[in-house]
Swiss-Prot record:
<dbReference type="InterPro" id="IPR000473">
    <property type="entry name" value="Ribosomal_bL36"/>
</dbReference>
<protein>
    <recommendedName>
        <fullName>Large ribosomal subunit protein bL36</fullName>
    </recommendedName>
</protein>
<comment type="similarity">
    <text>Belongs to the bacterial ribosomal protein bL36 family.</text>
</comment>
<keyword id="KW-0689">Ribosomal protein</keyword>
<dbReference type="GO" id="GO:1990904">
    <property type="term" value="C:ribonucleoprotein complex"/>
</dbReference>
<dbReference type="InterPro" id="IPR035977">
    <property type="entry name" value="Ribosomal_bL36_sp"/>
</dbReference>
<dbReference type="GO" id="GO:0005840">
    <property type="term" value="C:ribosome"/>
</dbReference>
<keyword id="KW-0687">Ribonucleoprotein</keyword>
<dbReference type="Pfam" id="PF00444">
    <property type="entry name" value="Ribosomal_L36"/>
</dbReference>
<dbReference type="GO" id="GO:0005737">
    <property type="term" value="C:cytoplasm"/>
</dbReference>
<dbReference type="GO" id="GO:0006412">
    <property type="term" value="P:translation"/>
</dbReference>
<dbReference type="GO" id="GO:0003735">
    <property type="term" value="F:structural constituent of ribosome"/>
</dbReference>
Length: 37
């Protein structure tokens, strides 16, 4: 899980979603997981 000021999809399978007011990226590749902090 990477915590970044700006989250962007890295590959085609990355999805940007909002969960409890936080922006997250979920993906099949665990290295691509991100959240905004």
């Amino acid at each position: 899980m990477k915590v970044r000021p700006s989250v962007k999809p890295i590959c085609d399978k990355c999805k940007v979603i909002r969960r409890k007011g936080k922006v997250r990226v979920i993906c099949e590749n665990p290295k691509h997981k991100q959240r905004q902090g």
